[in-house]
């Protein structure tokens, strides 16, 4: 697959994202909606963008790595959630489940889930948004509880994997910024059903 970049776009490397969400039609990713600020040079105004370019594979992969966090935060995968996540290799239970970190994200427990977006608030919190496809084929929309990425005071009730969640969100932010800058997946062009000669 060939991914493309547009030229002549503003530099989004310094954009401060507040929301990123896949736009989907009939179960297919068709674009990305984002809310962000570009900083002082642009008047520090909140901007929005909705593009109908297909998201690039690196962005989809980065969002896919958030799936275990969505599952754990929403308590959708109880048989794994209390045992830990792939980076907790000191846990014998996890060692028996996971060969490598990459294998962890493709575990069958996560196959029916999709992270479609996330949003930050002005107090340093984040909310993950996603879906679970039920055995009936229907879709259950999931919104994870808000988590403070850098709590000022620890209460013991924080999500246990905040460091990894923050790292993965930064990777997603980078990929969304590249998308805003023009990087996208291959465009799907519908072929004509009839040749021009056949229409005559």
Residue ranges and their predicted role:
Residues 197-200:
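Polybasic, proline/glycine-rich intrinsically disordered low-complexity segments
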Residues 104-195:
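Conserved binding-pocket/active-site segment within a compact domain
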Residues 1-123:
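OB-fold ssDNA-binding interfaces and closely related basic DNA-contact patches used
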